[in-house]
């Protein structure tokens, strides 16, 4: 069930991304939305954040206090992570209502954590530029994959309690 749902969701997502391919460089809707929400969160911490479309790729430039810090690309929008999460949950399908509610709640949590991690990364890079690689390579993935792992553990626990004799 995992592989099948993962392949179907990934195919649908890739078809969605194909819809946004054009000669004009501008990211897909979700990537743009994540960039806008990250900008708002960073700004709420009294930083002057702004996003601008990248001139030569499908991404948004993230600028904090007039310093270009990062690109927000399609891989930053958490959709691929949500697909991975959903595929795992569906491979342990429980009662329909419970499974769908958990999928929705998990997707919202992952999406929100993704916005938070982008804000942490941007502020961290701005304040501690010498730690850019560490923040992006270790802390950044740890936040999102740690969240997914915890959600998976919770789901397996719920599922196993519902199916124990």
Give the role of each language-model region:
Residues 1-165:
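Hydrophobic N-terminal alpha-helices or hydrophobic patches in metabolic proteins across all domains
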């Amino acid at each position: 069930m995992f592989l099948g749902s993962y392949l179907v969701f990934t195919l649908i997502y890739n078809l969605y991304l194909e819809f946004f391919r054009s000669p004009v460089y501008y990211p897909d809707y979700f990537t743009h939305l994540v960039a806008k929400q990250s900008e708002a969160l960073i700004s709420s911490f009294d930083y002057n954040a702004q996003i601008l479309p990248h001139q030569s790729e499908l991404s948004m430039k993230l600028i904090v206090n007039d310093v270009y810090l990062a690109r927000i690309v399609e891989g930053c929008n958490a959709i691929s992570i949500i697909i991975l999460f959903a595929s795992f949950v569906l491979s342990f399908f429980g009662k329909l209502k419970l499974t769908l509610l958990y999928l929705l709640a998990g997707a919202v949590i992952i999406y929100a954590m993704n916005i938070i991690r982008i804000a942490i990364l941007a502020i961290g890079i701005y304040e501690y530029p010498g730690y850019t690689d560490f923040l992006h390579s270790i802390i950044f993935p740890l936040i999102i994959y740690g969240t997914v792992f915890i959600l998976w553990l919770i789901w397996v626990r719920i599922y196993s309690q519902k199916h124990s004799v």
